[in-house]
Curated annotation (Swiss-Prot):
Keywords: Hydrolase. Belongs to the UPF0173 family. It comes from the Archaea. Pfam families: Lactamase_B_3 (PF13483). It comes from Pyrococcus horikoshii (strain ATCC 700860 / DSM 12428 / JCM 9974 / NBRC 100139 / OT-3). This is UPF0173 protein PH0120. GO terms for molecular function: hydrolase activity. InterPro entries: Metallo-B-lactamas, RibonucZ/Hydroxyglut_hydro, UPF0173_UPF0282_UlaG_hydrolase.
Amino acid sequence: MKIVWYGHACFLVKTKGVSILIDPYPDVDEDRMEKVDYILITHEHMDHYGKTPLIAKLNDAEVIGPKTVYLMAISDGLTKVREVEADQEFQLGDVTVKTFYTEHPTSQYPLGYLILGEKRVAHLGDTYYSPGFRELRGQVDILLVPIGGRSTASEREAVDIIDIIRPRIVVPMHYGTYGSTGNVESFKRELQRRRVWVLVKDLKPYEGFEV
């Protein structure tokens, strides 16, 4: 499995022969992306939906997201579009994806995605802490978690989320862009202060790793 962070909340997950892009924001450079088969969108805000129409057309990729995203994609002229809700399960080739509700009050249908490939990857989109995340405990190897603190989890709340889910690896996201703050080093210090032991992958935009 390969995971690439393209900045903000945008990731590429390559697993079992399938390339899945998540939340392509407006400033992402599509020319630096690998081929994409599917695009998962967590919610309708433009810092997550941004370049979806362009990238979908360039790759002939299917767009998958909640009702608001489905309607936006149809309005943008896309035809390969699928609507999903929380607590669903679906297949992308040989990869199983599960949806779950996230705590983002300014969105109508905020979703997270649990991608079950060679490893289990959860993308939280925009979210605050939610006790419901306890249901993900034991199901996540790699957690993609926001730390920016503007309409989403702060560094402290991100540690709360990690402590309740207990993944093996964490990739911080959604910080230092579009008015969000957050800092990876202070996030790491908060983890240490709270004695929450997890491997943190501090990626630069367009960097990735294999697991």
